[in-house]
From Swiss-Prot:
Its cofactor is Zn(2+). One of its GO terms (biological process) is response to stress. Binds 1 zinc ion. It comes from Streptococcus pneumoniae serotype 4 (strain ATCC BAA-334 / TIGR4). This is Protein SprT-like. It is found in: Cytoplasm. SMART domains: SprT (SM00731). The keyword DNA repair does not apply.
Length: 149
């Protein structure tokens, strides 16, 4: 898929306005589907969203970024908080938030339990049980589950 041609097509079909700036993939985007840069008008998109969630979700993200784009160049409110943005986003059926991506490098949760009061602690990082104690009763902590690394 040629990204620039696709964004131009979505802009004409859904907004009735041409897109005349630059579009590019940005692999460094983590928690967002795309970004609009008002300074020069270009758009960045997260390729993982397209690969993992498919074309339907990606089209809605393109619509979201094009809402920012077209409203900015019309001199209207283009930020998420602005009424113009919210109304246009709803009219073109764009996504407000990106659905979460399957994260392959997320850390497994470690579960610790106090031996005295049975208080549970969930942590992504290891706790030194020789050094740290329960925050409620000062009892010893015990690692309950050891996730596979």
């Amino acid at each position: 898929m040629k990204l620039t041609d696709y964004v131009k097509q979505v802009s004409l079909e859904d907004f009735g306005r041409p897109f005349i700036h630059h579009v590019q993939w940005n692999r460094r985007l983590r928690s967002t589907g795309g970004r609009f840069f008002p300074k020069d008008g270009h758009l960045d998109f997260n390729p993982k969203v397209y690969q993992e969630l498919g074309l339907d979700v990606f089209r809605k993200i393109v619509r979201h970024e094009l809402c920012h784009y077209h409203l900015y160049f019309q001199g209207k409110g283009y930020q998420h908080k602005d009424r113009d943005f919210k109304e246009l986003l709803k009219a073109v059926d764009g996504l407000r938030f990106v659905p979460s991506l399957p994260n392959s490098n997320s850390k497994p949760i470690k579960l610790y339990r106090c031996q005295s009061c049975q208080q549970r602690y969930q942590r992504k990082r290891r706790i030194d049980t020789q050094r740290y104690r329960c925050g409620l009763c000062r009892g010893k902590l015990l690692l309950v589950n050891q996730p596979e690394d």
